[in-house]
Swiss-Prot record:
<dbReference type="InterPro" id="IPR005215">
    <property type="entry name" value="Trig_fac"/>
</dbReference>
<feature type="domain" description="PPIase FKBP-type">
    <location>
        <begin position="163"/>
        <end position="248"/>
    </location>
</feature>
<dbReference type="InterPro" id="IPR046357">
    <property type="entry name" value="PPIase_dom_sf"/>
</dbReference>
<dbReference type="GO" id="GO:0051083">
    <property type="term" value="P:'de novo' cotranslational protein folding"/>
</dbReference>
<keyword id="KW-0132">Cell division</keyword>
<dbReference type="Pfam" id="PF05697">
    <property type="entry name" value="Trigger_N"/>
</dbReference>
<dbReference type="InterPro" id="IPR037041">
    <property type="entry name" value="Trigger_fac_C_sf"/>
</dbReference>
<comment type="function">
    <text>Involved in protein export. Acts as a chaperone by maintaining the newly synthesized protein in an open conformation. Functions as a peptidyl-prolyl cis-trans isomerase.</text>
</comment>
<protein>
    <recommendedName>
        <fullName>Trigger factor</fullName>
        <ecNumber>5.2.1.8</ecNumber>
    </recommendedName>
</protein>
<dbReference type="GO" id="GO:0051301">
    <property type="term" value="P:cell division"/>
</dbReference>
<dbReference type="GO" id="GO:0015031">
    <property type="term" value="P:protein transport"/>
</dbReference>
<dbReference type="InterPro" id="IPR008881">
    <property type="entry name" value="Trigger_fac_ribosome-bd_bac"/>
</dbReference>
<dbReference type="GO" id="GO:0043335">
    <property type="term" value="P:protein unfolding"/>
</dbReference>
<dbReference type="GO" id="GO:0003755">
    <property type="term" value="F:peptidyl-prolyl cis-trans isomerase activity"/>
</dbReference>
<dbReference type="InterPro" id="IPR008880">
    <property type="entry name" value="Trigger_fac_C"/>
</dbReference>
<comment type="similarity">
    <text>Belongs to the FKBP-type PPIase family. Tig subfamily.</text>
</comment>
<keyword id="KW-0131">Cell cycle</keyword>
Amino acid sequence: MAAKWEKKEGNQGELTFEIGADKISEGIDKAFQRTKKNLNVPGFRKGKVPRQIFNQMYGEEALYQDALNIVLPEAYEEAIKETEIEPVDQPQIDVDSMEKGKPWVLKAVVTVKPEVKLGQYKELSVTRQNTRVYAKDVDAELESRREKQAELVLKEDQPAAKGDTVVIDFKGFVDGEPFEGGESENYSLELGSNSFIPGFEDQLVGVKAGDETEVKVTFPKDYQAEDLQDKEATFKVTVHEVKTKELPELDDEFAKDVDEDVDTLEELKAKIKDELKEQKESAAHDAIEDEALNQAVDNAEIQAIPDAMKEDDIHRQMDQYLANMQQQGIDPKTYYKLTGTTEDDLHKQFAADAERRVKTNLVLEAVVEAENIKPSQDEIAAEVKDLASQYNMEESAVRGALTDDMLSHDIAIRQAVDLIADSAKQNAKAEDKKDDSDKN
């Protein structure tokens, strides 16, 4: 089949291709078989009219449009392969000629992937983050674990302070009327947690068990319930209990309580230091990767990104995000209700960086091509095994869902990222070079 690609302005071009006699005949045969099922012709049972009679009555041309619809998808795909173009959107296809006894000629306006001209992407200069673990880092983590092990004990006839927890009943009113969601009983609220309406917690500092009080607040302008935005409200509050945190002693017993693999506080400190070191090194690697990748993208020349590519990216991000929520037992409807957002809000959230994500992927694909990165069958097999383990699937199910080309593409992209990051020249911050502080 003859196919010709002519690049036009921007990311568009014209794809001219033919559908040959054999395919046309095949399409007409299938179109006739579909058409005759519902055809009533005098002298013949329904659906039994011969082809010759049909042609005499209606002409073979009456089947052309249906035949075209049948053979066009395959013909278009073959034309794409022949011309080696990469469409990113649905084409606009028009019939150029459809004459009996001749190949059908079609012209398609096609939007293709933007061209990428790579700049420097290897040996880029990046900043290495400080990965030292200091005594203060270990102390902060120990304090965090103490907070998690804290017990709430009743404060007898003592006023509530910030950091204390009050157990309250409350009922809210706007313009003298109660509102939906504004009432609760035996609600535990940590003062200073900023988990309630701004100003609410501050007005409970100083209350005691048994107190009844009123709290006056103004709902934020961006409050999730639109009917309450910027509204003044009064809450009637009854205080049942005031509790304060009692932190455990920082000793060997505490260490054994928070980590069954250690016997002493010193062992816990050493383990925390190792964990923090691993976290910092992982974060530093990610930062180098991000900085190097951003430079590689900035150094490249990339044609304008088609809207279709940005939309595809946005919907992929949304699907992945909602799938992750689903794995946590939160379906999309529940997610939107809990967050007070809509599908449009989520779309806008991912739209903000869609163009950058698409550009990054285009640059990585260009690096894969420039470096001739081709994952081996062993690497593909290992990827299948990892995915099967990650998603608790059979390897055969992974193979059924993903082709080798798809798996190879994902592996190659990751290898391109590694190449860019690993070749980068890492420079320590000036203050890190001078820093001779306690490394614990």
